[in-house]
C-alpha cells in the first residue's frame, strides 16, 4: 500500500436533533484536517460516503464538504454509496486516488442522518439494499432474520452465542465515548425475550440488532512521503474490496463468501495470517453477522463460530478482541459513517 491515515475526527453517534447532514459533514471535515495539521488548500480530492436513499431531502451531498472551508472550492468531491460498506468504500476510493498518483492528500468523510424519518419509512429505505425483485421483506431485519434462521436450521440454535456477542459489545461500548449506547446490559437480558427485548425478526431480538443513528466521521489520507513529515501516521498494510451477487438466491448466504474472500485477499496482500492480528472490527449489523464473520475470517470452521465467543477468544481480554469499539450494536449504525 502507498497511503497512511494522518488525521481523523468523529462525532458521537445517536439522535443528533440539532445537527443536519451539512452540520455533521462540516464538523468532522474541519476536525480531521485540523487533527492532521493539513490546510484545506492542500487537499487534492474529497470522497464522501453516505447511503442517502431518502433519509434526508438534500441531494448532491458531496458538494456539502466544501462548506467546511472556502479553500475547498473547486476541489474534486465524489459521492460514494455501497450500502453498509459505504464508509469503507469512500476510504478505498481515497486510497486508489493516492495509489494512482492523482494527489497526495485526500479527505474522506462518512455521514448519515437516519432519525428524522419514521420507523416505517426507515424500514422501507433499508429494505432497498436487498434484491427487491425476489426479496420482499418489509425490513432489513427480516432479511437477516431469514439468514439467521437458515444458519440455525443447518447448525442448530445458536441463540446463546448471539446473546453473548450482544452482551460483549454492549460492555465494550461502555468504554467508547463515541458510542450511542453506553450500557452494560448483561447476558441474561440479551438472552431472554421480554417487553424491553422483544423478537424483531426470526430468532433475532432487539438486542441482536444494531442501532438507528445519526453520525459522521472523517479521516485524512496522504502518501507515505507526506506522512513521514507529519506528527503521526497509521500505514495501510492492505485494503481489499469485493462485491458479491445481490440476490440471496445466487449465493449461499450463511457462508458469508464475500467477506471470506475479502479477508483472504487482505491477509495475502499484507503477508500475514489471522494469528498475527491484535484485534478486529467487523460488521455486526446483527449479532449473527458477527458470528458469521468469525467463520469468514478463519477464526473457526463453518458452523462453529460459537466456539470463538464461548471460549472467550473475542472478548476484550481474549486472544483476538472483536468489536472493542462496541460494534454497531452499541456504537450505532449511521450507514455512511
Model-derived regions: residue spans:
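Electropositive phosphate-/nucleotide-binding environments in soluble metabolic enzymes
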Residues: 18-26, 59, 88, 138-145, ...
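Beta-strand segments within the central parallel beta-sheet cores of soluble alpha/beta enzyme folds
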Residues: 40-50, 76-82, 106-110, 160-167, ...
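Short glycine/threonine-rich loop-to-helix capping motif typified by GTGT followed
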Residues: 53-61, 248-252, 284-307, 318, ...
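Condensing-enzyme catalytic core mediating Claisen C-C bond formation in acyl metabolism
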Residues: 1-22, 130, 163-165, 198-261, ...
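N-terminal leader/propeptide and maturation segments of large enzyme subunits in energy/redox metabolism
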Residues: 138-193
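Short acidic, glycine/serine/threonine-rich loops at helix termini
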Residues: 17-19, 58-60, 92, 117-123, ...
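Conserved catalytic cysteine-centered active-site region
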Residues: 53-109, 113-143, 182-211, 242-244, ...
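Conserved active-site "lid/cap" helical segment
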Residues: 1-84, 93, 151-158, 180-190, ...
Amino acid at each position: 500500500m502507498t497511503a497512511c491515515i494522518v488525521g481523523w475526527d468523529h462525532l458521537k453517534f445517536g439522535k443528533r436533533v440539532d445537527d443536519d447532514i451539512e452540520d455533521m459533514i462540516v464538523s468532522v471535515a474541519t476536525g480531521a484536517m485540523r487533527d492532521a495539521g493539513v490546510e484545506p488548500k492542500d487537499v487534492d480530492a474529497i470522497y464522501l460516503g453516505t447511503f442517502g436513499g431518502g433519509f434526508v431531502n438534500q441531494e448532491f451531498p458531496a458538494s456539502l464538504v466544501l462548506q467546511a472551508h472556502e479553500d475547498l472550492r473547486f476541489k474534486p468531491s465524489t459521492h460514494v454509496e455501497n450500502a453498509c460498506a459505504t464508509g469503507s468504500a469512500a476510504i478505498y476510493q481515497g486510497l486508489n486516488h493516492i495509489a494512482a498518483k492523482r494527489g497526495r492528500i485526500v479527505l474522506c468523510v462518512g455521514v448519515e442522518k437516519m432519525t428524522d424519518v419514521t420507523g416505517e419509512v426507515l424500514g422501507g429505505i433499508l429494505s432497498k439494499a436487498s434484491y427487491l425483485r425476489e426479496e420482499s421483506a418489509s425490513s432489513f431485519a427480516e432479511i437477516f432474520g431469514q439468514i439467521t434462521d437458515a444458519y440455525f436450521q443447518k447448525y442448530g440454535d445458536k441463540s446463546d452465542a448471539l446473546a453473548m456477542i450482544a452482551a460483549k459489545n454492549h460492555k465494550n461500548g461502555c468504554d467508547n465515548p463515541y458510542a450511542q449506547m453506553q450500557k452494560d446490559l448483561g447476558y441474561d437480558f440479551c438472552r431472554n425475550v421480554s417487553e424491553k427485548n422483544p423478537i424483531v425478526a426470526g430468532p433475532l431480538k432487539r438486542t441482536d440488532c444494531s442501532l438507528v443513528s445519526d453520525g459522521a466521521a472523517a479521516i485524512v489520507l496522504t502518501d507515505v512521503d507526506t506522512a513521514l513529515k507529519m506528527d503521526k501516521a497509521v500505514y495501510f498494510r492492505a485494503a481489499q474490496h469485493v462485491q458479491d451477487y445481490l440476490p440471496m438466491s445466487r449465493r449461499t448466504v450463511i457462508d458469508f463468501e464475500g467477506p471470506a474472500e475479502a479477508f483472504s485477499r487482505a491477509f495475502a496482500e499484507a503477508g500475514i495470517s489471522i494469528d498475527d492480528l491484535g484485534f478486529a472490527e467487523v460488521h455486526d449489523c446483527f449479532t449473527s453477522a458477527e458470528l458469521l464473520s468469525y467463520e469468514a475470517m478463519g477464526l473457526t470452521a463453518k458452523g462453529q463460530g460459537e466456539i470463538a465467543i464461548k471460549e472467550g477468544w473475542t472478548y476484550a481480554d481474549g486472544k483476538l478482541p472483536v468489536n472493542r469499539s462496541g460494534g454497531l450494536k452499541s456504537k450505532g449504525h449511521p450507514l455512511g459513517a
